[in-house]
């Protein structure tokens, strides 16, 4: 399975940093500056893992996650936040997130969460056979 990731963040710096770190780690990365751009990309391609910022201008990450779940329940969705104290994993799971990452972004923090996401996808596919 090709390890494709979609990164959604309205901050250019964060998006570029994630793209560089994940590409360097061997993943195939696409990115979008808004949920609307992300939905356009998702119509053309399947992304097993989606990493999205929680606070964005046009649509927040929670609404974005809920809309993804309405369309596609198999992707692993990882929240990205600089405000870890405002969110807890259980609340995020209730709205459809699989996991979360906190800023500042570092590869040694991201890679285990992303790999767990790909493992979860593999298990979901096995259970649907």
Regions inferred by a protein language model and the residue ranges of each:
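Alpha4 helix (beta4-alpha4-beta5 surface) of REC/receiver domains from two-component response regulators
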Residues: 63, 84-99, 112
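Short amphipathic alpha-helix used as the core "switch/output" element in two-component signaling
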Residues: 40, 62-73
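Helix N-cap/capping motif at the beta->alpha junctions
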Residues: 31-40, 61
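Receiver (REC) domain active-site loop signature in two-component systems and cognate sites
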Residues: 56
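Charged docking surfaces used in two-component/phosphorelay signaling
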Residues: 16-24
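C-terminal output helix
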Residues: 105-114
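Active-site beta3 strand of CheY-like receiver
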Residues: 45-51
């Amino acid at each position: 399975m090709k390890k494709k990731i979609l990164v959604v963040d309205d901050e250019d710096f964060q998006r570029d940093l994630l793209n560089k770190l994940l590409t360097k780690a061997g993943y195939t990365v696409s990115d979008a500056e808004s949920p609307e751009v992300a939905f356009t990309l998702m119509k053309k391609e399947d992304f097993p893992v989606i990493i999205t910022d929680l606070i964005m201008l046009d649509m927040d990450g929670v609404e974005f996650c809920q809309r993804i779940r309405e369309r596609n329940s198999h992707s692993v969705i990882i929240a990205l936040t600089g405000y870890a104290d405002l969110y807890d994993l259980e609340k995020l799971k209730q709205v459809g997130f699989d996991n979360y990452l906190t800023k500042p972004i570092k590869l040694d923090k991201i890679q285990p969460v992303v790999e767990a996401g790909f493992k979860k996808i593999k298990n979901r596919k096995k259970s649907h056979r």
